[in-house]
């Protein structure tokens, strides 16, 4: 028993002495005696786990990470050939469906949330798609000409250019602010606080362009004011001459309507078409016989021109109401359009009949 303990103590002392002579670096653990191979098994499991984590999470631009799902989402956006595919909606999608799709994708692809390569461009494409499809006029124009423009700009089936064919009135950043007030729903992350380099370049470039434009406008402002005055000078001269001419000219001998300011308060009718007109108290002394007949022809011509213009306006108003009723399927507008009377058109028909009869 003592011999056994003695040999065990000697073995322990020898092991400690070996450890002292061969110290391991602090950053490398000592290799342990593993006759069963358990350590190798655990090491294999760790390497396998590390490979799985790498397949799920990869390094993005800078020190940010992104998932495989985010990368696949960006690649899907790049492959889309129209705005409907980008938002993942049908061509007859309603406004609510468009808003719902945009809200979901904007949060998913915002550069603060998605650091995958191309996420910024995908975010811009999503914003541009919603800005166009949410505008009735632009959506109608896109539905009519969008496919033709795709064929023209991409004859070799290249990815669709989302930024040139249809220009929007609002940037993706401003559109995101409209929906989320400049913040994510959590309220913690501000717009573009950690975006990629191309987005910073995009914002710096536009800031520089705005400053340059403002500087040029300030430099050209005096010259622009002077040029505008020179251009308006002929118009001002014409207006002044016209006013002076009207002040110096004598009052017209008649009016188609009652005008007390001109003294045209006495009602008369033309002999041929019974067109009503108004004159002053001295009219009978100035116009008799042939001069009266010539003047009444002029009156009838002026009246017919006035009635024709009024008739055209009535038809235009009725046509617009009818089109609006059909567009919005509004029964009230339809009834209003049908009940609208074309009084001046009826007067014009009577005048034409009288002229033919005369």
Swiss-Prot record:
Gene Ontology cellular component annotations, sorted alphabetically: endoplasmic reticulum membrane
Record's bilayer topology term: Single-pass membrane protein
Alphabetized GO MF terms: Hsp70 protein binding
Positions of disulphide bridges: none
InterPro entries tied to this protein: DnaJ_domain, DnaJ_domain_CS, DnaJ_subfamily_B/C, DUF1977_DnaJ-like, J_dom_sf
Location (main, coarse): endoplasmic reticulum
Transmembrane domains' residue ranges: 228-248
Name of a matching Pfam family: DnaJ
Signal peptide: none
GO BP, one annotated term: chaperone cofactor-dependent protein refolding
Gene3D superfamilies: DnaJ domain
Residue ranges of domain J in the record: 82-146
Alphabetized SMART domains for the sequence: DnaJ
Keywords per UniProt: Chaperone, Endoplasmic reticulum, Membrane, Transmembrane, Transmembrane helix
Subcellular location(s) per record: Endoplasmic reticulum membrane
Keyword Transferase listed: no
Protein name in the entry: DnaJ homolog subfamily C member 18
Gene this chain is encoded by: DNAJC18
């Amino acid at each position: 028993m003592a011999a056994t303990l003695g040999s065990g103590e000697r073995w322990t002392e020898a092991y400690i002495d070996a450890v002292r002579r061969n110290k391991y670096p602090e950053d490398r653990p000592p290799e342990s005696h593993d006759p069963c191979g358990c350590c190798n098994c655990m090491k294999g499991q760790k390497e396998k786990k590390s490979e799985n984590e790498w397949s799920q999470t990869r390094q993005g631009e800078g020190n940010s990470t992104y998932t495989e799902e985010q990368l696949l989402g960006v690649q899907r956006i790049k492959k889309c050939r129209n705005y409907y595919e980008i938002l993942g909606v049908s061509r007859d999608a309603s406004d609510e469906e468009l808003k719902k799709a945009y809200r979901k994708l904007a949060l998913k692809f915002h550069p603060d949330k998605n650091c995958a390569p191309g996420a910024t461009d995908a975010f811009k494409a999503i914003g541009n798609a919603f800005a166009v499809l949410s505008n009735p006029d632009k959506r109608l124009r896109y539905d009519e000409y969008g496919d033709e423009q795709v064929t023209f700009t991409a004859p070799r089936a290249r990815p669709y250019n989302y930024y040139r064919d249809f220009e929007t009135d609002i940037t993706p950043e401003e559109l995101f602010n409209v929906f989320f007030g400049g913040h994510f729903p959590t309220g913690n992350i501000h717009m573009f606080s950690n975006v990629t380099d191309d987005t910073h370049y995009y914002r710096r470039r536009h800031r520089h362009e705005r400053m340059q434009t403002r500087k040029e406008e300030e430099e050209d402002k005096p010259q622009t004011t002077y040029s505008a005055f020179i251009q308006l000078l002929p118009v001002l001269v014409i207006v002044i001459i016209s006013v002076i001419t009207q002040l110096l000219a004598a009052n017209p001998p008649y009016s188609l309507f009652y005008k007390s300011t001109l003294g045209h308060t006495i009602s008369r009718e033309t002999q041929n078409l019974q067109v009503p007109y108004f004159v002053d108290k001295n009219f009978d002394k100035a116009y008799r016989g042939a001069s009266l007949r010539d003047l009444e022809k002029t009156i009838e011509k002026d009246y017919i021109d006035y009635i024709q213009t009024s008739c055209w306006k009535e038809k235009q108003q009725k046509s617009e109401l009818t089109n609006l009723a059909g567009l919005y399927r509004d029964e009230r507008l339809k009834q209003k359009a049908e009940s609208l009377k074309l009084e001046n058109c009826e007067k014009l028909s009577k005048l034409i009949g009288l002229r033919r009869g005369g």
